[in-house]
């Protein structure tokens, strides 16, 4: 059984959903980034969703763009990221680890080579934000060849045809958009997602994690009540990093204090 499946099985036995924080690897620097990822897991994160720094993140709001800039200023490259992720994998063998990134970085060294490096680092899934299902053929083929789940976004406006493709091509989990637009905690998540979840279930999609604009425990609770398998929080986590760049210890404490109630909110 793969790591996502066994996670969702374990959580179901405890009547819990998943809480999954997102951070950019290498933000604000490699050494602190490793401590950040460890802190998130120790504070209760069920899985990690990670970004690889990129100079032009199209789907991201200003908070995550700032994380990219800090990491790039600290000379973080994909090689540095894979090394850090490998260290997290060694420390937490059961933890599902996903990447959320852009096609340019996948193309940079060849698609197969990229997924092979993911597999070696112990990564479970890859979501490429700017590749829709109808353009995903070569990415899905390479992902499957190396045992990596391709993850797809189910937007609130999706047609049945799109949701069927997301369900058939995707594995691990489905990234459920709570609203259209760029990422960010500034604009609160728009529920209701129940109708979208019902449609996904019709196509037997992988379990849905609700993302975009999730910044408070009550939003996590709402996602679980609506039927999502869990929630992903990115900008709210990265904002804590941004606000504490000069105080590394205070940053880790604030991150732990954010994650613990978010995880507690997944209890049904």
Swiss-Prot record:
Record flagged with keyword rRNA processing: no
Signal peptide per UniProt: none
Pathway this chain belongs to: Amino-acid biosynthesis; L-tryptophan biosynthesis; L-tryptophan from chorismate: step 5/5
Record Pfam families: Trp_syntA (PF00290)
Catalytic activity entry: (1S,2R)-1-C-(indol-3-yl)glycerol 3-phosphate + L-serine = D-glyceraldehyde 3-phosphate + L-tryptophan + H2O
UniProt-annotated catalytic positions: 49 (proton acceptor), 60 (proton acceptor)
Keywords: Amino-acid biosynthesis, Aromatic amino acid biosynthesis, Lyase, Tryptophan biosynthesis
EC number: 4.2.1.20
GO molecular function annotations of the record: tryptophan synthase activity
Entry GO CC: cytosol
PANTHER family per record: TRYPTOPHAN SYNTHASE ALPHA CHAIN, CHLOROPLASTIC, TRYPTOPHAN SYNTHASE, ALPHA CHAIN
Main function: The alpha subunit is responsible for the aldol cleavage of indoleglycerol phosphate to indole and glyceraldehyde 3-phosphate.
Protein family per UniProt: Belongs to the TrpA family.
Subunit text: Tetramer of two alpha and two beta chains.
Protein name: Tryptophan synthase alpha chain
Organism for this UniProt entry: Vibrio atlanticus (strain LGP32) (Vibrio splendidus (strain Mel32))
Taxonomic lineage from the root: Bacteria, Pseudomonadati, Pseudomonadota, Gammaproteobacteria, Vibrionales
